[in-house]
Amino acid sequence: MASGKFITFEGIDGAGKTTHLQWFCERLQGRLAAAGRQVVVTREPGGTQLGEKLREILLNQPMDLETEALLMFAARREHLALVIEPALARGDWVVSDRFTDATFAYQGGGRGLPRDKLETLERWVQGGFQPDLTVLFDVAPQVASERRGAVRMPDKFESESDAFFSRTRAEYLRRAEEAPHRFAIVDATRSIPEIRQQLERVLAAL
């Protein structure tokens, strides 16, 4: 575990990924400490001063579908340039709550934006750069909806229908099927202790 790696957490809203991210990062940091490496914890959209401003807009303001995708990738370019790439160059590890798979799942699968348009933006913004590992928290939209209903006021995406999240989930699973070497799928319907057991296996494989 000496060289820097980029890990992403993905899943539909209500899958529980954010609940487990800090625990995962603390466990990972414990394993990296002896090598003098740090774990940089970040998120998308966001992670930078500009990215957080764009996040506030993206999560709360209605907008044209293509504008939404363009702003997502604009925030991502800033995130890569200011946070992710410098951290990896130092040999640190980066764990991000969402990355490009979320754009394909939400703007592509959920919103219906053509995949070729997203692929064009992906090539422009990140070239061939991809996460070393993507942990996908998979859960049925109905279960995720019940979880979302038990928390704070929902943002624009959290307020979407089960049908939207069914399309989003399907796109996540399709991407996982296309890149099985990169994805680790977590059964997010399980209890917190059971999910953490799954994450322990993910950590052991790093």
Swiss-Prot record:
Q: Which GO terms describe its biological process?
A: dTDP biosynthetic process; dTTP biosynthetic process; dUDP biosynthetic process
Q: Which organism is it from?
A: Burkholderia cenocepacia (strain HI2424)
Q: What is its EC number?
A: 2.7.4.9
Can you state which reaction this protein catalyses?
dTMP + ATP = dTDP + ADP
Please verify whether the record's keywords include ATP-binding: yes
**Organismal lineage:** Bacteria, Pseudomonadati, Pseudomonadota, Betaproteobacteria, Burkholderiales
Q: Which CDD domains does UniProt cross-reference here?
A: TMPK
Q: What is this protein called?
A: Thymidylate kinase
Question: Keywords of this protein's UniProt record, alphabetized?
Answer: ATP-binding, Kinase, Nucleotide biosynthesis, Nucleotide-binding, Transferase
**Where along the chain is ATP bound?**
G11, I12, D13, G14, A15, G16, K17, T18
Supply the Pfam families for this chain: Thymidylate_kin
